[in-house]
Amino acid sequence: METSRLIQIIEMGAARNLMDYVQAFQLWAPKSAAAAMPCAGGLAAYTGPDSPLTTVKGAGPDLQESEIEAAELFFRRNHARQVVFECAPWLTDDSVERLKRRGYTVAGTEVVVAAKLPCGVEAPGHTPIELMQDDWARVFQAAFELPAEAICPLLAQVAWRLPGSVKLGVADADGSVMGCAQMAPAGEIAVLGNDGTLPEARGKGVQTALIRERLRLAMKAGFRWAVAEVAERSQSEKNYLRCGFERVYVRTSWIHA
């Protein structure tokens, strides 16, 4: 498959996954005043002023001035603190110039990795288990070392409620959960995310076991692709590549405060 076609599939999946989050916020956290609108072929989402999911995902390669203006108006009306476009590398030179001219700057990047299914999967080094909601919330917050305030507990709650998702963990010999991870459907894509390992359990193969188990579940469910977003040169990237994923592209975040 051509890389451009795969990027399109993944970006469509990212927008769909973001919409699932918005709907979960609307249903389970109505005070967040979550909202969404189509934007440049993707989705603009508001899920709270401090939420990392207040962003645009899935935008196409050609961002028109009118589409950027519409997104800015959407976020302004919803009292967002900034406007964020998370864009694939197919963004045209003209689109980049439009963003720069309006004051956008690059705030960060993430690597998108993918595995075509079916694929070979080694047996997990640990036995993954499905997590109960209390364990999920506790490990989610501790693994990501998030403060117990503002958006953090809400993100854990909403992620748990994501439709069709599977929430997994790995426990030690005493039954204490050492890490968490999630798989969520987005069309033909299984989105692998929310990978977190408690600080004291890192380096023990927890994430690798959870990646392998989600690959197994994704194949059983008939997905064509498994996709994840990781920080460049991170241990997570190494673990995913070790499990058979390949780097597909780097997504760039353009921000205007």
Annotated model-derived regions:
Residues M1-R76, A150, W160:
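N-terminal charged segments
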Residues Q64-L73, N194-P199, G203-K220, R242:
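Conserved acetyl-CoA-binding loop-helix of GNAT-fold acetyltransferases
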Residues N78-A88, A218-A231:
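Conserved GNAT acetyl-CoA-binding A-motif
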Residues A148-E200, Y249:
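A conserved beta-strand-loop-helix scaffold within acyl/acetyltransferase catalytic domains
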Residues T92-V106, K204, T208, K220, ...:
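Conserved active-site alpha-helix within GNAT-family acetyltransferase domains
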Residues M1, A36-A40, K116-M132:
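Conserved N-terminal entry element of GNAT/NAT acetyltransferase domains
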Residues A35-A40, D94-T105, S165-A181:
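Conserved beta-hairpin
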Residues Y46-K57, A107, P185-G193, R202:
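A conserved beta-turn-beta hairpin within the catalytic core of GNAT-like acetyltransferases
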